[in-house]
């Protein structure tokens, strides 16, 4: 199984207050959040957003089946900065960014055939726009988690450098969990703290 990025983080014990105000800003199906919910023992106050209403509808079904009732879903396009947040600042932001999906290609090798380097650049630009619009909503001592299922440096390490240089967040850990040799998906995670 994959180590969940939320579980490996050493939170500064003094600075943490529960329930942890959390924003999953590219929620899609909410899987990452459900794991975070378990790890943090439900001590979490959650906002979830996605660019598509349909993704949030699926997420509501999944949350309902899992017995998760207390959350605030909303539609937001993070490639722009004109979205409204109920909570101005969060202690934890999870950004499972849209990506090329190159970490899943062991299942669909034909993707490689259609793929162009230009697409990597387009995704990287989109990822930078998304993190640039999410990070300003992180509290001091807050944790920002960046996740992709890509194996490309442009979508991973280069975005990490962008976050460090532009927002001066401190990188706590960064890991590419390689799955392709095990016929599983690869996943990249990076965790930052705003000091």
Name each model-derived stretch.
Residues 1-195:
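S-adenosylmethionine
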């Amino acid at each position: 199984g994959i180590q969940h990025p939320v579980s490996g983080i050493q939170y500064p014990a003094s600075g943490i207050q529960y329930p942890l105000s959390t924003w999953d800003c590219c929620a899609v199906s909410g899987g990452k959040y459900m794991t975070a919910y378990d790890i943090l023992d439900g001590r979490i106050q959650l906002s979830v957003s996605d660019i598509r209403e349909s993704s949030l509808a699926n997420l509501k079904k999944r949350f309902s089946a899992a017995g998760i009732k207390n959350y605030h879903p909303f539609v937001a396009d993070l490639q722009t900065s004109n979205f409204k947040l109920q909570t101005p600042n969060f202690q934890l932001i999870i950004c499972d960014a849209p990506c090329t999906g190159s970490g899943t290609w062991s299942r669909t090798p034909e993707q490689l055939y259609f793929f162009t380097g230009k697409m990597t650049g387009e995704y990287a630009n989109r990822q930078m726009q998304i993190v640039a619009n999410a990070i300003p909503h992180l509290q001091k001592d807050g944790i920002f988690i960046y996740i992709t299922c890509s194996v490309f440096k442009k979508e991973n390490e280069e975005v990490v450098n962008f976050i460090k240089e532009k927002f001066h967040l401190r990188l706590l850990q960064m890991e590419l969990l390689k799955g392709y040799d095990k016929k599983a998906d690869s996943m990249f995670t990076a965790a930052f703290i705003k000091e």
